[in-house]
UniProtKB/Swiss-Prot annotation:
GO MF annotations in UniProt: DNA binding
Biased composition (Polar residues): 1085-1100
The gene coding this protein: TOF1
Superkingdom field: Eukaryota
Protein known as: Topoisomerase 1-associated factor 1
Residue spans of biased composition, Basic and acidic residues class: 887-910, 965-993
Lyase found in the keyword field: no
Alphabetical list of InterPro entries matching this protein: Timeless (IPR044998), Timeless_N (IPR006906)
Length: 1171
């Protein structure tokens, strides 16, 4: 039987092939010209248009590739189109026929070079033609870039220049189409690359990335792109997406750090790379030689291995004879796990893949670096701002891959900007002293991607990628967020203050969102077979995010984060607007539950890094970094350092080393150091890893010795419920305590009288069905009013009979407030509105604020007040208000913010921060200055000093020796210092207490009125005499200078002040009151150059221009004391018509001397009056 020869399979319809071939033949050729020059046919323009119709109406409409296959077989592009473009590329624009032919060629070039995509909806015809077309497109690119007679790309730029020169408002649809075709062709040239599964015949580099970059630079494509990018949004609007694709395909996979290395170091780096490759090859050969077959082992070897369970296994190979360890390693290598395979969508691995590294030639590196620098300087902000807005509004030109390309391009160029700055810094350091210093550039060149709109878009993009499990998009988003964080970190250390402020603002915006923290955590925890590049991106993001967040939280102790819990409560309230707290079934009563939850929300927003870092230290996070560490032989130093830092944080910073105590993890760590195939000891990270692993093993051995049962846990992953017990050997002690209701207060302006306040609170309680509590409080107040009235009447009767007994019992006894049942007792602790009503009624709490604390009516509340409270509550209880001026009474109350709340929240931040010594030692100094001596005490002190001097003169010869005196002096100073540290100065205490002291207020205003009257009399006398009062006081002070003994002031002048006048002339202090606001005016408007250190009063801050005194010596001039002294001097001046200057010399001995004030007509002239 004869075998029939196989028949040739027609891959294309013969009729279609004949039509296409006839059109290509009629287009033209070189056969009719002896010089080999291409000659067009008679109707070349018609042939070009017919070919375009065949591509459009046959291939595109019928979803076939037959026409493209025929054109590739007959070599239309390299044989016809490229020669035609070179022939007419330099033609004048006025030649319409040649311009049309050039445009027709461009219309064919674009579909022929359009990238062939591999997707899940490919037909049988697509699978047949795709490999051939991919190979043909590589040939197309090689022919276009390597055409020697003339530059093809520059000729095609000339096709689009007339349309680009037209203003955007005047361009037609045809002009926009020509510009788009030109850019699409450049995009196609950038995209086409040699497919990895197809062989390449030629060894040249005409189709590589380096050849593309060199051609773009030499044929002015980069100049065209820079022009369009810098004018994006003005002259060009619809070309942004195409330009993004060109940039993406030019820079993807390019190592940014290598791009900006110094030329002197480039050769060294290449040599180092070559040495590393050769060293890796030697290691592989060495490992292979250990197990390589020899001529004596050609017959093979097989042995039996007896395992622990008395079972036998067979292992082949001579290498198993070396020992037990080699035998078991061979057994482990032969084990295979048939992992179940799931059907996944077919995706072209080369499509939009930005992870594959690309190496460039030196010329391409130089050209690309030049283009990137110029693009960052002029085109980055306009292009990416326009792109972001187009993506946000989902413009028609935006495709599925646009967002991915956008975020990757942002990350790449941000990395390039940081690398360029580092390159410039190294250049300045190398040329330091040889050229003038150049001011550092601002980060405003990349400001368009560092605003809030970009962060919102990036968060939305990452969340969308997580929801739809688009891991390639998520990888681009993670890379972008990482580069943004690193750029902000560089901005924070910039010498420009503006950049530092912007960096602080950006960090606060990024770290303020708790959703960002949760997203980074979920990405790290949920890694599962997404690939190495996804693993590398997520671990890098977690490492950078955690490190920067730690630094930021240390710098901002009061850091706050916005939680999503509050939004959920608002949604729940919106869904059930009329549901009250009783129906909700909460633990708290009425609206107190909402207020307590709101307080809890505010507390949860207070960020604690220690608590947050614990969330990173989980078994899933450890598994992710373990998956990265398994590639330790392929990882670089930065990636190894990243994993090392995480394991160190888990084991030693967080004391969660038990998470690493698992058999596979321990085996991996041991293999990294001891081998086989471990880390290279010559690499820098080896020593760090060796020390870390040694400490981990040391910890493991110690814990196994303490708790041998932990051996069982080495087989399993750890869960959060048992991690603490496994680490410390005991359960975590948690104490739950009930918190009281949050203190409330009425909103400002809601009520001005006691009646209105009680009306609001009572109405709010009754609206929540708490009328029994209001009735109970009313009864308590009624009975208390009767009891207090009886005591007052009894006390009045007792006073008339025996005044001595009345003085012994001057205060009424306090009245205890007892709850009627357990529900009332709980409401006194948990119901915030009832507690507010109790405080309005004068009740006070005795003990600590816990459940069952005692409340009482203090003795200071008279019966009349209690009766008034009782009547007001009864009145509003009988007729409560449903709303007050159209507002719900419950909305007129708010949470009361107290200093205790602020201190407690602040303590939560600062409990782990070292602020120095906690004790009040010598470094802390005196916390409060002692109270100033009163007038009588000052005179008494002066007299005692005189007596001591006389006694010391008489007993000078019989005194103790120097050693005893020195010991006594040291003891006195030590005791005085200890006393001063314990002093709570009366000045500082009264600064806040006097605000609520009615008696002190009455006394203060009485003194103020007396001072105003005295000042008015002095002014009137000065106006009548027409002479300033200071003249008389000056004469009188000179006359009395010899009689009075002057006391040396306690505080000395500055050096500059003491040199301005002789030290013998000491003038006493002058104190002048301001009749406008009663403030103390010191040292204002003096013409003397001398100025002493004066207390920093408000007037001194406004008018004084000198430096304020040091805060180490706080001025504690008591207001009450000074006013009392001034009042006495004013009265003496008003009665006797004498100056108060002489008295001030002895009285105000504790204050610094001030310069003399200028007066005119009895008024003090300040510095602002000179003008």
């Amino acid at each position: 039987m004869e075998i029939e020869p196989p028949q040739a399979v027609e891959v294309v319809d013969p009729e279609v092939r004949s039509y296409v071939y006839s059109l290509v033949t009629a287009l033209g050729g070189t056969a009719g010209n002896e010089t080999g020059r291409y000659v067009l046919g008679d109707d070349a323009l018609g042939c070009l248009r017919d070919l375009k119709k065949w591509l459009r109406f046959y291939d595109e409409k019928l979803n076939r590739m037959d026409v493209a296959r025929c054109l590739a077989e007959c070599k239309l592009l390299n044989g016809d189109l490229v020669p035609i473009i070179s022939l007419y590329g330099d033609a004048e624009q006025s030649d319409k026929h040649k311009a049309r032919i050039m445009l027709a060629c461009l219309e064919l070039l674009v579909p022929l070079t359009w990238p062939v995509e591999v997707h899940g909806q490919m037909t049988f015809n697509h699978h047949r033609h795709t490999p051939y077309l991919q190979y043909s497109q590589v040939e197309y690119k090689r022919g276009i870039l390597g055409f020697a007679p003339s530059p093809i790309l520059r000729a095609l730029i000339r096709v689009g220049l007339p349309s680009m020169a037209i203003p955007r408002s005047e361009r037609s649809t045809r002009d926009e189409g020509i510009i788009r075709l030109m850019l699409y062709f450049f995009r196609n040239i950038a995209v086409i690359s040699s497919p990895p599964n197809l062989p390449i015949d030629s060894d040249d580099d005409k189709a590589t990335r380096s050849a593309t970059i060199n051609a773009f630079q030499q044929q002015d494509v980069f100049a065209l792109l820079l022009t369009m990018c810098s004018n994006m949004g003005n002259d060009f609007t619809f070309q942004d997406v195409i330009i993004l694709e060109i940039l993406f395909n030019l820079v993807k996979g390019v190592d940014v750090d290598q791009l900006f290395k110094l030329n002197e170091r480039a050769g060294t780096i290449k040599t180092d790379d070559l040495q590393d490759i050769l060293q890796k090859e030697d290691e592989l050969n060495r490992e292979h030689s250990k197990n390589a077959p020899t001529r004596h082992g050609r017959f093979g070897t097989m042995i039996w291995v007896k395992r622990d369970d008395e079972k036998l296994s067979t292992v082949s190979g001579q290498d198993v004879l070396k020992g037990d360890r080699a035998t078991f390693l061979k057994m482990d290598k032969t084990k295979k796990w048939n992992k179940p395979k799931f059907k996944r969508e077919v995706v072209d691995p080369s499509s939009n893949n930005f992870n594959l590294k690309v190496r460039l030639t030196s010329s391409a590196t130089k050209h690309l670096r030049t283009f990137v620098e110029e693009f960052l300087d002029s085109g980055f902000n306009p292009l990416f701002t326009h792109l972001r807005k187009a993506i946000e509004r989902e413009a028609d030109r935006v495709t599925e891959s646009t967002s991915r390309q956008f975020w990757y391009a942002v990350s790449w160029f941000l990395h390039a900007e940081r690398a360029r700055r580092e390159h410039q810094k190294e250049t300045r350091q190398r040329s330091k002293g040889t050229s003038r210093e150049i001011e550092p550039d601002s980060f405003s060149l990349v400001a368009s991607v560092l605003n809030q709109e970009t962060f919102v878009g990036l968060n939305r993009f990452m969340q969308h990628s997580i929801d739809f499990k688009d891991w390639q998009d998520l990888t681009a988003g993670m890379k972008c967020l990482t580069q943004i964080l690193l750029t902000v970190q560089e901005m924070a250390i910039s010498p420009l203050e503006e950049d530092q402020e912007i960096a602080e603002n950006i960090q606060s915006r990024i770290f303020y969102e708790e959703t960002t923290h949760d997203r980074v955590l979920s990405i790290l925890r949920n890694y599962k077979d997404q690939g190495f590049w996804y693993l590398d991106a997520c671990t890098e993001l977690a490492h950078v995010f955690l490190r920067m967040l730690e630094q930021y939280s240390k710098q901002n102790v009061d850091m706050q984060v916005r939680s999503r819990r509050r939004a959920r409560r608002k949604q729940a309230q919106a869904a059930v607007p009329n549901q009250n707290e009783t129906e909700a079934g909460g633990e708290h009563d009425s609206d107190t539950e909402d207020i307590a939850e709101a307080h809890q929300t505010v507390t949860e927003r207070s960020f604690d890094f220690k608590r947050f870092s614990v969330r990173f230290c989980t078994q899933k996070s450890v598994d992710t970094f373990v998956a990265l560490t398994k590639y330790y032989r392929e990882l670089d130093s930065e990636q190894l350092k990243r994993a090392h830092r995480f394991f160190y944080r888990v084991a030693f910073k967080q004391d969660m080393s038990v998470l690493l105590f698992r058999v596979d993890i321990i085996s991996l760590l041991f293999k990294m150091i001891k081998g086989p195939e471990g880390l290279d000891p010559s690499k820098p990270p080896f020593k760090d890893w060796e020390e870390l692993i040694r400490q981990i093993f040391k910890k493991l051995v110690r814990k196994l010795g303490e708790r041998p049962e932990l051996v069982v846990e080495l087989l399993f992953s750890k869960i959060n419920a048992t991690v603490f017990y496994l680490e410390y050997g005991h359960e975590k002690q948690t104490m739950s305590e009930s918190r009281p209701a949050t203190e409330l207060e009425l909103k400002p302006g809601s009520a001005s009288t006691l009646d209105e306040k009680i009306r609001i609170v009572v109405s709010a309680l009754i609206q929540e069905d708490k009328k029994p509590l209001v009735k109970w409080l009313s009864q308590v107040l009624g009975s208390a009013a009767s009891e207090r009235l009886s005591w007052e009447m009894e006390a009045e009767a007792r006073a008339t009979s025996s005044p001595q007994e009345q003085s012994d019992r001057s205060k009424a006894p306090s009245i205890a407030v007892l709850p009627e049942d357990d529900g009332c007792r709980t409401a006194m602790f948990r119901n915030a509105r009832l507690r507010l009503l109790m405080r309005l009624a004068g009740l006070e709490r005795l003990d600590e604020d816990v459940l069952g604390a005692s409340w009482m009516i203090p003795s200071s509340v008279p019966s009349s007040n209690l009766k008034e409270y009782h009547e007001l509550i009864e009145k509003h209880c009988e007729s409560p208000a449903e709303d007050i001026d159209g507002v719900d009474p419950r909305d007129l109350m708010r949470r009361k913010r107290t200093a205790a709340d602020t201190d407690s929240s602040r303590h939560e931040f600062t409990e782990n921060v070292n602020f120095g010594s906690d004790s009040e030692g010598e470094d802390d100094g005196v916390l409060f200055p002692p109270n100033l001596p009163e007038r009588s005490k000052a005179l008494k002190t002066l007299k005692q000093r005189r007596r001591r001097r006389r006694r010391s003169d008489d007993a000078e010869e019989s005194g103790p020796d120097e050693a005893v005196l020195e010991a006594r002096r040291t003891a006195r100073e030590k005791n005085a210092l200890e006393r001063q540290r314990k002093i709570k100065s009366d000045l500082y205490v009264h600064a806040s207490d006097d605000e609520s002291d009615e008696e002190a207020d009455i006394e203060f205003f009485a003194k103020e009125e007396m001072r105003r009257q005295a000042q008015a009399r002095r002014v009137a006398e000065a106006l009548e005499t027409g002479m300033p009062e200071n003249n008389t006081t000056k004469k009188k002070s000179k006359a009395s200078a010899g009689r009075k003994r002057k006391v040396k002031p306690v505080l000395e002048l500055d050096d500059d002040d003491s040199e301005a006048s002789p030290p013998k002339r000491r003038r006493s202090d002058e104190v002048i009151e301001s009749d406008s606001d009663g403030e103390l005016m010191v040292g204002i408007g003096s013409t003397s150059p001398r100025r002493s250190q004066t207390p920093p009063t408000s007037a001194d801050n406004i008018f004084g221009s000198e430096k304020s005194p040091s805060p180490m010596f706080p001025w504690s001039v008591g207001v009450d004391q000074m006013m009392a002294k001034l009042q006495g001097k004013d009265e003496a001046s008003a009665d006797n018509g004498e100056s108060n200057e002489d008295e001030g010399e002895d009285v105000l001995s504790g204050t610094g001397r001030t310069r003399r004030r200028r007066t005119m007509g009895g008024f003090v002239i300040g510095s602002d009056s000179d003008s």
